[in-house]
Amino acid sequence: AFVPGGSSVPVLPANLIYKTANGDDRLMSYESLSDGGFATGSMLGSGGFIVYDDRACIVRNTWNFARFYHHESCGQCTPCREGTGWLEKVLWRIENGQGRDEDIDLLWSIQSKIEGNTICPLGDAASWPVAAAIRHFRDEFEYHVRFPEKVKNRNHFVNEPFSKVLTSNV
């Protein structure tokens, strides 16, 4: 997976890093990265790139982003003040083996109520990573909910990458 611009931009799965959803070559340009909107694209942000291999836990990384945005929220507008807190709480629950089946859809609902409804762009920046993580890596969220005993180990994908875990537990 690849985050082409810091924590506030949507993460792309491996299949969308080099090619767009239409099969065109993806360049590291604003236009190419935005191809397909946030459903299949992303954007350049701060100039910082984050690259994940299959041992990285997308849920944990999304939770870390949510913690950051919750901490940074000034609290002036309700969607950001309350929404970022809820994103952090629900992601913590999933990452720590206490997730429920409905939590993934709850995250989707929360992020959709934050995006476009805040005074400043921090709310959008908080919602986009969550939306992209669920859109592209829902199977990893479902794994966390289905196998809580396995994800309680902080290094759950270091020793056994998720790509291998997924095929062995299907």
Question: Where on the chain are the PLM-derived regions?
Answer:
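Redox cofactor-anchoring modules in respiratory/redox and cofactor-processing assemblies
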Residues: 1-170
